[in-house]
Amino acid sequence: MGQIFSRSASPIPRPPRGLAAHHWLNFLQAAYRLEPGPSSYDFHQLKKFLKIALETPARICPINYSLLASLLPKGYPGRVNEILHILIQTQAQIPSRPAPPPPSSPTHDPPDSDPQIPPPYVEPTAPQVLPVMHPHGAPPNHRPWQMKDLQAIKQEVSQAAPGSPQFMQTIRLAVQQFDPTAKDLQDLLQYLCSSLVASLHHQQLDSLISEAETRGITGYNPLAGPLRVQANNPQQQGLRREYQQLWLAAFAALPGSAKDPSWASILQGLEEPYHAFVERLNIALDNGLPEGTPKDPILRSLAYSNANKECQKLLQARGHTNSPLGDMLRACQTWTPKDKTKVLVVQPKKPPPNQPCFRCGKAGHWSRDCTQPRPPPGPCPLCQDPTHWKRDCPRLKPTIPEPEPEEDALLLDLPADIPHPKNLHRGGGLTSPPTLQQVLPNQDPASILPVIPLDPARRPVIKAQVDTQTSHPKTIEALLDTGADMTVLPIALFSSNTPLKNTSVLGAGGQTQDHFKLTSLPVLIRLPFRTTPIVLTSCLVDTKNNWAIIGRDALQQCQGVLYLPEAKRPPVILPIQAPAVLGLEHLPRPPEISQFPLNQNASRPCNTWSGRPWRQAISNPTPGQGITQYSQLKRPMEPGDSSTTCGPLTL
């Protein structure tokens, strides 16, 4: 059914919650007297039965083992019945008075005994606590302490004061199992107790050894050395037993220092059963009082003084303020906490009134059941309308903007052959330049300047497809920045065998030496507003995978104008409003880190540009394509210029 406990098992299996330590040791020692020895299944069934028995009102100290045996169900698994039978045999039996004889005639009654002669004293056959016995009755053999043994012993006595019954029972059981020497006992004392307790124990042990040596001990030879030395001899088993008994007796002189709260602070709760409160007091006194100290007077006093008011009234009314503990438990056995009974008060239904409701003017219902909303007491303080409350005023409700119709794409990288300018909706009044010449059939058609629209919700971030020739094309989100001279791509887009060169970059955060690399392989970039890819002969590679920037080297090949449509409620970037024309000068201040190469001569504040109308300049048409380039002319601010407006940025 389970594993048989050997001598190397834990000194004491853990007791069930709510059972005093000395009571659990009685069950433990009775189980050790079984032949063959108990198993783990037997201890499990014993603890399960004790948990059920502790819930009954028969928890009176000392425990009546005969009553516990009567509570055991028939056919209960395990060997719990044998353990209780051993305890019943060793328990002190109180002689009961003989039953009175049946009534009969006075002539036939036998003469009564002399009432002045008291009955003879019957000495108990067994003490309340069973003597410690080694499991299976095997003789103990000396075994040195192991760390797990010391930890198990310390865990058992962690809530008991040195010298208390639980402490002494645990130490006695450990001494019987391990048969320690004088050195082992000294190590155990230093591991379990504080330095003050060890010093007091050492003084008391020296006095007891001096008395024993003077009195004379069987087998003790004064010429062979002190008792501590002779007790370490394996051949002197008797002297070792004497030294162990003296070592245990030295704990009797130690002052009790309970680790639990003080006994005066253990109070009965308002809804706590009285027997549970007395059990807490009993366990606290067992753990704190030194062995041999009378416990009953203290327990009776605290059982009345620390009880709640309801139990104190019951005990005072029945005259059990300082009675035996059993009378106090029986007096409060029928008391239970007063639970608040919830009573549902049902209001009787009244007939509907015959008078009309003052709110709606109809009869047949009360005003509290009227479905018509209550009229406001006066006009609305916001709009002076007397028909609604202030909380329903339309001025407090935000106006819901009408959904905007979806815009058609404004950018087609195709030649435009229309003679008139093309209007750009909600583009700030800007118009695309018209075509200057007619398209001939045998010539390539001239194209107008393409418009690059940006989404107002996500500007200036666009999606682009990058092909590095060494890996598969990948789609990324890149920053469209007109202030960056070169395009920056993360190193994750390139394969490990891509040749890279070291370069120094001067950006907004200063000059960097190892943040960016330079690639010499061509890179293809496909933008959403361009049908043909952009070919870059070289670009910067971000080794930290922080930036993906489309710079001026790529935007110059688009030959377009950045067009930002103005929404009804333009989005806000940080504390400023996003401008209609995007440039580096309109962005927030860059962070103090190396991010992208910056040409400080290429970007200037907007107020340094001329406020005069844009000038059209035709310069160096691209050979073979016939595409006209438009650019803006920059010059320093003149004294007569006062306008600081900016036009579209032409690349």
From Swiss-Prot:
Which principal EC class is assigned to this enzyme?
A: hydrolase
Please give the annotated consequence of changing residue 547 to V: Almost complete loss of protease activity
Name the reported effect of residue 508 to I.
Decrease in protease activity
Q: Which residues carry this modification: Phosphoserine?
A: 105
Which chain positions have N-myristoyl glycine-type lipid attachment? 2
UniProt motif (PPXY motif) ranges: 118-121
**Region Disordered: start-end pairs:** 93-144
Q: Name one GO cellular component term.
A: viral nucleocapsid
Q: What are the boundaries of the CCHC-type zinc fingers?
A: 355-372, 378-395
- The EC number of this protein is 3.4.23.-
- Peptidase A2 domain residues are 476-554
What other note does the entry give for this protein? HTLV-1 lineages are divided in four clades, A (Cosmopolitan), B (Central African group), C (Melanesian group) and D (New Central African group).
Which PANTHER family does the annotation name? ENDOGENOUS RETROVIRUS GROUP K MEMBER 24 GAG POLYPROTEIN-RELATED, IGE-BINDING PROTEIN
Q: What is this protein called?
A: Gag-Pro polyprotein
From which organism does this entry originate? Human T-cell leukemia virus 1 (strain Japan ATK-1 subtype A) (HTLV-1)
